[in-house]
């Protein structure tokens, strides 16, 4: 479940060459992780157009903030790996009744965080980086609780890597700041989130 052969070279970007596509990355990870699984449907959420667009914009914003294509790529790759592994556990009924309660709590918290992301963008002067950061960190803690008995410390490290980045108050300040590049990223992220909310996916 938690092995990652070829971790060092997978997905590295050559200097000066910008080539990033979250759908392609999700499909690569899906093929690798699920090569021995009966179903390939578990990653559908990550490979639909709307989710791919959101991940692409998160990559661009992360690349701009970190000034590192490699780091931004790793953040999104960790998002995909976490989602795939949790999806496998969920679809194979590996969670106990108590853990399923944690799943529901996580879904509600993610829904709250998603609506907050959009609200802070759509309603002027409402952005509060502390509130949004706290919501994302609560999502992180619920995920740790959920996979405690299922995944390795490496996966827990990925969860920290992803949520600590997106909950970074300095990153959130830049994302919601006046920069046109970040505003474009945020608008597309919120458009995608609104679609997922309307569809009941989030």
Curated annotation (Swiss-Prot):
Coiled-coil stretches noted in the UniProt entry, renumbered to this chain: none
Q: Which family does it belong to?
A: Belongs to the TNFAIP8 family.
**Keywords, sorted A to Z:** Cell membrane, Cytoplasm, Lipid transport, Membrane, Transport
Lineage, opening ranks = Eukaryota, Metazoa, Chordata, Craniata, Vertebrata
Pfam families recorded for this chain? Answer: DUF758
Naturally occurring in which organism (per UniProt):
Danio rerio (Zebrafish)
Location (main, coarse): cytoplasm
Has UniProt tagged this entry with the keyword Membrane? yes
Write out the function statement from the record: May act as a lipid transfer protein.
Q: What is this protein called?
A: Tumor necrosis factor alpha-induced protein 8-like protein 3
Name any Gene Ontology BP term. Answer: lipid transport
- Here the segments flagged for biased composition (Acidic residues) are 1-10
Membrane is among the record's keywords? yes
Which residues does the annotated region (Disordered) include? Answer: 1-21
UniProt gene name: tnfaip8l3
- Please give the InterPro entries that the UniProt record associates with this protein: TNFAIP8-like, TNFAIP8_sf
This protein's GO cellular component annotations are: cytoplasm; plasma membrane
* Subcellular location(s) per record: Cytoplasm; Cell membrane
């Amino acid at each position: 479940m938690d092995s990652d052969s070829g971790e060092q070279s997978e997905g590295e970007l050559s200097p000066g060459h910008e080539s990033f596509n979250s759908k392609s990355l999700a499909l690569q990870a899906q093929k690798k992780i699920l090569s021995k699984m009966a179903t390939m449907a578990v990653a559908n959420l990550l490979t639909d157009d709307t989710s791919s667009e959101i991940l692409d914009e998160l990559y661009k914003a992360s690349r701009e903030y970190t000034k590192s294509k490699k780091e931004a790529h790793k953040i999104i790759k960790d998002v995909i790996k976490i989602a795939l592994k949790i999806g496998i556990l969920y679809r194979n009924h590996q969670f106990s009744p108590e853990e399923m309660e944690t799943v529901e709590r996580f879904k509600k918290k993610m829904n709250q965080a998603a609506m907050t992301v959009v609200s802070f963008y759509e309603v002027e002067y409402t952005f509060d980086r502390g509130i949004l950061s706290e919501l994302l960190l609560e999502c992180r803690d619920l995920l740790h609780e959920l996979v405690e008995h299922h995944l390795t410390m490496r996966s827990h490290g990925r969860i920290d890597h992803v949520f600590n980045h997106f909950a970074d108050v300095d990153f959130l300040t830049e994302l919601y700041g006046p920069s046109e590049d970040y505003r474009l990223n945020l608008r597309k992220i919120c458009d995608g989130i609104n679609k997922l909310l309307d569809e009941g996916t989030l």
